Amino acid sequence: MRVADFSFDLPDELIARYPMAQRNASRLLTLDGNSGALGDKQFTDLLEMINPGDLMVFNNTRVIPARMFGQKASGGKLEILVERMLDDKRILAHVRSSKSPKVDSLIHLDGGYQMKMVARHDTLFELELLSELTILEVLEAVGHMPLPPYIDRPDEDADKERYQTVYNQNPGAVAAPTAGLHFDDAMLDALKAKGVNIAFVTLHVGAGTFQPVRVDTIVEHKMHSEWANVPQDVVDLIAQTKAAGKRVVAVGTTSVRSLESAARASLGELKAFSGDTDIFIYPGYQFQVVDAMVTNFHLPESTLIMLVSAFAGFDHVMAAYQHAITQKYRFFSYGDAMFVTKKAH
């Protein structure tokens, strides 16, 4: 398939630049992967669609304030976007400046902190913090929330809370697992009260999630790598859920990719997994674990719309997106959501 097959025209006003006042006040488009049937709902209607005994799997990564500003030794301004933390002092990062910083040169960050340019790895720079503090402490002090480019505004104080799930736990993401943004504590409690089981995996979403696919045919695309962790207790819960004939519902494409990575690493049998994954899911992929998913509306030609198309059928998904545009759903990170069931192969 060609990347251009996943293109669609989106009116600019449908890109959500701010979240709804209440997390669960979004709309929800339901898509039956088998029939292609669509339903226009409210996000809170999801409670009626998840059955007792179903297992919902969430990504509990925490978004770090990954964008920093500073100056090179020459005085030229630069912007740093963390791609991943290598340890307490070192990061891999995207650096934007008029000229790339040289190896061994110093970078002066806002707030008086200093970093040293250690090495260059293709388009990424390895930087080392020269401080008693850790990278996380410096990011919390001077970093900005790394809002995606299409939100097209500076980050605000409110984004520190709203571009973060209520159940975030493990710092390391530079983009939010956005399907999870719709859930508040009351909704999670209501799901549990109904007898729905809740589990957490971790996938530290990288800035690569926003990189455009720069090839013509999707099989040529080289997927970026991200760190994921699927613990043994989640594997056990999934086995119990499947044995009882219930569904595994992944909240977000990152949860889908975590679970399917764990199955891929052990050749189809789900086992605990911790490490880097570059799994690229596109039409033709056979899902091993996930039966249904909650997901936001994704960018045209992105690897994420390809994943949803693999799950529910290309024609069904593209038709659903056209319906969403006609019905003026809000798109992307701060936008509305879909509840999608898997197409039988």
Swiss-Prot record:
Keywords, sorted A to Z: Cytoplasm, Queuosine biosynthesis, S-adenosyl-L-methionine, Transferase
Pathway: tRNA modification; tRNA-queuosine biosynthesis
Chief site of localization: cytoplasm
Protein name (Swiss-Prot/TrEMBL): S-adenosylmethionine:tRNA ribosyltransferase-isomerase
InterPro entries, alphabetized: QueA (IPR003699), QueA_dom1 (IPR042118), QueA_dom2 (IPR042119), QueA_sf (IPR036100)
Gene3D superfamilies: QueA-like
Function: Transfers and isomerizes the ribose moiety from AdoMet to the 7-aminomethyl group of 7-deazaguanine (preQ1-tRNA) to give epoxyqueuosine (oQ-tRNA).
Subunit structure: Monomer.
EC supergroup of this enzyme: transferase
Pfam families: Queuosine_synth
SUPFAM superfamilies for this protein: QueA-like
Organism: Shewanella sp. (strain W3-18-1)
Family: Belongs to the QueA family.
